[in-house]
């Protein structure tokens, strides 16, 4: 299994001691060094397969490309914007996070910010420390009956909603992924963004920082908001346009803002932080003892479980690899890679469209995780840029000029009609289609271009296969082929044939090693190829 050779892990940011202990108890070597420069980080990674960071370490493309052994980057926290995901994916490096670790701490901070905004608690505290008694200046507003708009209804947004509902707030929200039915189950009515702005007394954001969410609150959206709206951002700097927020505060369109995050941290410009109606913190969303312990524990457990082949969770850039650890899906991943390898050997260097077709109830949603494995088989000996694996397969296949499509068929691929679950790989517009299935935990080849094998042909990583197609049985054919093997010093380990199809038969020989050339074979066969995956 991929990443099973992970042996040494660098922890480059401050983490709870439980992280190191769990890693060591799991059999991993651990090095802890913090406040490293880019050059020092690269030097430390030269003999490390794993890296665990919080938010301080910047895992840039330069770091990733220079770390020859690096296989996995773990972020002890939710956001991974300090990791260059594209560079990591291109190099086949797995990136994980701990999406649950700091959810409660971030949600509680958000709720505290909302309450502080409503009652101006930090400003009143500062006034008291300054020796003043200004009761009239700090007139607040009740939360009961007010409308809270929650943008992003994942783990943190959900926890915020539940807590603020207990204070009598009405919660509305928006999330392009969470369904309205799911959000309704925790008391949030979903609305289009243009309907949310004018309804909200308070707005809190809980989305990742993406091109689509950068500047989500801007001059245009502030203009659509209720006058005196209050805004909270404990998610990522940049989701709220800081210039637009300052202008809204200065005009009174926004009555107050609570910010735990900034576009630049620490912020060089002081206009927002110094504004009298702004509450700010130095990115404290995950800064609780419980969150730090939980994040350190979770990322360490994820590393150990991955190395032991037990499970893979928190994956950011390789859904297919997550599925590869499922007992049901794992052999199908192996089958998909085998069929991709077979297709490359059979069709040469295929171009154009590769079709990945699944059949059977349990494979209905498997196409998206099986297609990267097919790509691995297609490209693993052809890719000139990087070692191809389940992490970078979809990225590299486009550069190879291939378009891989997936579909699910209620009937057997190729209308062969055998078995409940099948996987077919075909080259669109060309006479190349291979069909396989899994028997127990063993991937097997069921058919080639409509020619069916009975029994099916086992596909084993330790068994090279020679496949050739001939006219209907010639008594002298088999002795001739065995003689050709002997001349090459190759032993015959197994032999199977397909049912006759269009007057021809496919033959499959398990052999002790791949043949140096197939020219002699092609004199006796319509076509011949060999492969080993």
UniProtKB/Swiss-Prot annotation:
The modification N-acetylalanine is found at residue 2. One of its GO terms (biological process) is L-serine biosynthetic process. Belongs to the D-isomer specific 2-hydroxyacid dehydrogenase family. Keywords: Acetylation, Amino-acid biosynthesis, Isopeptide bond, NAD, Oxidoreductase, Phosphoprotein, Serine biosynthesis, Ubl conjugation. Its EC number is 1.1.1.95, 1.1.1.399, 1.1.1.37. Catalyzes the reversible oxidation of 3-phospho-D-glycerate to 3-phosphonooxypyruvate, the first step of the phosphorylated L-serine biosynthesis pathway. Also catalyzes the reversible oxidation of 2-hydroxyglutarate to 2-oxoglutarate and the reversible oxidation of (S)-malate to oxaloacetate. It catalyses: (2R)-3-phosphoglycerate + NAD(+) = 3-phosphooxypyruvate + NADH + H(+); (R)-2-hydroxyglutarate + NAD(+) = 2-oxoglutarate + NADH + H(+); (S)-malate + NAD(+) = oxaloacetate + NADH + H(+). Homotetramer. There is a cross-link at residue 21 (Glycyl lysine isopeptide (Lys-Gly) (interchain with G-Cter in SUMO2)). InterPro entries: ASB_dom_sf, D-isomer_2_OHA_DH_cat_dom, D-isomer_DH_CS, D-isomer_DH_CS1, D-isomer_DH_NAD-bd, NAD(P)-bd_dom_sf, PGDH, PGDH_ASB_dom. The modification Phosphothreonine is found at residue 78. It comes from the Eukaryota. The keyword Ubl conjugation applies. The active site is at residues 236, 265, 283. There is a cross-link at residue 21 (Glycyl lysine isopeptide (Lys-Gly) (interchain with G-Cter in SUMO1)). GO terms for molecular function: L-malate dehydrogenase (NAD+) activity; NAD binding; phosphoglycerate dehydrogenase activity. Pathway: Amino-acid biosynthesis; L-serine biosynthesis; L-serine from 3-phospho-D-glycerate: step 1/3. The modification N6-acetyllysine is found at residues 21, 58. This is D-3-phosphoglycerate dehydrogenase. It holds the Pfam family 2-Hacid_dh. PANTHER family: D-3-PHOSPHOGLYCERATE DEHYDROGENASE, FORMATE DEHYDROGENASE 1. NAD(+) binds at residues 78, 155-156, 175, 207, 234-236, 260, 283-286. The modification Phosphoserine is found at residue 14. It comes from Pongo abelii.
């Amino acid at each position: 299994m991929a990443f099973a050779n992970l042996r040494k892990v660098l922890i480059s940011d401050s983490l709870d001691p439980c992280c190191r202990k769990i890693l060591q108890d799991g059999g991993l070597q651990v090095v802890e060094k913090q406040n490293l420069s880019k050059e020092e980080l690269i030097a430390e990674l030269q003999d490390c397969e794993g890296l665990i960071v919080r938010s301080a370490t910047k895992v840039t493309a330069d770091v990733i490309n220079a770390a020859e052994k690096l296989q996995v980057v773990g972020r002890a926290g939710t956001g991974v914007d300090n990791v260059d995901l594209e560079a990591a994916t291109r190099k086949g490096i797995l990136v994980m996070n701990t999406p649950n670790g700091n959810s409660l701490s971030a949600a509680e901070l958000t709720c505290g910010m909302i309450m502080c905004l409503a009652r101006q608690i930090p400003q009143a505290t500062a006034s008291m420390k300054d020796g003043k008694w200004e009761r009239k200046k700090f007139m607040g507003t009740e939360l009961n009956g007010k409308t809270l708009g929650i943008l992003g209804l994942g783990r943190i947004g959900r926890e915020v909603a539940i807590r603020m509902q207990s204070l009598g707030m009405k919660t509305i929200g928006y999330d392009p992924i969470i369904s309205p039915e799911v959000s309704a189950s925790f008391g949030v009515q979903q609305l289009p963004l243009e309907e949310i702005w004018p309804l909200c007394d308070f707005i809190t954001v809980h989305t990742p920082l993406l091109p689509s969410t950068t500047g989500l609150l801007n001059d245009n959206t502030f203009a659509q908001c209720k006058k005196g709206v209050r805004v909270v951002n404990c998610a990522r700097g940049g989701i709220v346009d800081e210039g637009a927020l300052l202008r809204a505060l200065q005009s009174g369109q926004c009555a107050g803002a609570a910010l735990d995050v900034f576009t630049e941290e620490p912020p060089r410009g002081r206009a927002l932080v110094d504004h009298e109606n702004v509450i700010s913190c130095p990115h404290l969303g995950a800064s609780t003892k419980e969150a730090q312990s939980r994040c350190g524990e979770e990322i360490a457990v994820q590393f150990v479980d991955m190395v032991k082949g037990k499970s893979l969770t928190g994956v950011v850039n390789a859904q297919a690899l997550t599925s590869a650890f499922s007992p049901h899906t794992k052999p199908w991943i192996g089958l998909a890679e085998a069929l991709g390898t077979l297709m490359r050997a059979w069709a040469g260097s295929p171009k154009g469209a590769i079709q990945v077709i699944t059949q059977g109830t349990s494979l209905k949603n498997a196409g998206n995780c099986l297609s990267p494995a097919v790509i691995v088989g297609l490209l693993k000996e052809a890719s000139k840029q990087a070692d191809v694996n389940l992490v970078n397969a979809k990225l590299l296949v486009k550069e190879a000029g291939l378009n891989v499509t997936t579909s699910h068929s209620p009937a057997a691929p190729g209308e062969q009609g055998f078995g409940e679950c099948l996987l077919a790989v075909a080259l669109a517009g060309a006479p190349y289609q291979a069909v396989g299935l899994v028997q127990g935990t063993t991937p097997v080849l069921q058919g080639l271009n409509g020619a069916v094998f009975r029994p099916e042909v086992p596909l084993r990583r330790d068994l090279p296969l020679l496949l050739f197609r001939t006219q209907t049985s010639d008594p002298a054919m088999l002795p001739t082929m065995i003689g050709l093997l002997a001349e090459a010093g190759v032993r015959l380990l197994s032999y199977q044939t397909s049912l006759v199809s269009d007057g021809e038969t496919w033959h499959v020989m398990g052999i002790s090693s791949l043949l140096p050339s197939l020219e002699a074979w092609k004199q006796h066969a319509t076509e011949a190829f060999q492969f080993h995956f």
